[in-house]
């Protein structure tokens, strides 16, 4: 916020300057005027760790989106793309019938899931994706993965793009 000066009214009024001479004998109220600078500052996770062990068990971590803006923001879109030969499948896919090392992956983030087969998908967002000023949005995520012949620990399998915009009025 930037201080604009002292004024004779809460809104509008005349600015009081160092050249003004005060001759009032009664109490007088002056009002500080500020210009609020809107700031859009949001921190999104750089990595959502996902480990698949030899038994096909998926292990995830904790993540959150942090809103450091001067107002509410909303996640308006979440798009995912596969990397390194992986393919998206619906999250409810039964992976027991998929070949070992088929590199298929169904993904869930908060209450939104993959529903298509392919390399990219923009998720249908379900549940609240708004983040109050100075608030946080916890990100829970999970995956179903086709069986692997060796653990997958240090390979990028997805790229996720969060689109955020001002929320509220």
Residue locations for each model-derived region?
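Local beta-strand/beta-hairpin segments that build beta-sheet-rich folds
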Residues: 13-22, 116-118, 122-132
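Short beta-strand segments and strand-loop junctions that repeat across beta-rich extracellular domains
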Residues: 1-2, 31, 81, 108
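C-terminal, structured domain-capping segment
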Residues: 36-37, 63-70, 121-169
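Surface-exposed interaction patch
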Residues: 36-121
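Extracellular/surface recognition and adhesion modules
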Residues: 3-6, 30-32, 63
């Amino acid at each position: 916020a930037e201080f604009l000066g002292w004024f004779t009214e809460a809104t509008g009024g005349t600015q009081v300057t160092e050249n003004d001479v005060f001759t009032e004998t009664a109490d007088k109220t002056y009002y500080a005027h500020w210009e609020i600078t809107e700031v859009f500052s949001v921190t999104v996770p750089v990595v959502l760790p996902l480990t698949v062990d030899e038994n096909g068990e998926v292990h995830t971590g904790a993540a959150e989106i942090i809103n450091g803006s001067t107002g509410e923001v909303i996640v308006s879109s979440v798009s995912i793309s596969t990397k390194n030969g992986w393919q998206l499948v619906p999250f409810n896919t039964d992976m027991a019938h998929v070949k070992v090392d088929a590199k298929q992956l169904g993904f869930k983030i908060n209450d939104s899931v993959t529903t298509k087969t392919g390399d990219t998908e923009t998720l249908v967002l379900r549940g609240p994706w708004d983040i109050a000023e100075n608030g946080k949005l916890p990100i829970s995520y999970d995956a179903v993965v086709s069986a692997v012949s060796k653990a997958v620990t240090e390979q990028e399998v997805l790229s996720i793009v969060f689109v955020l915009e001002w929320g509220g009025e």
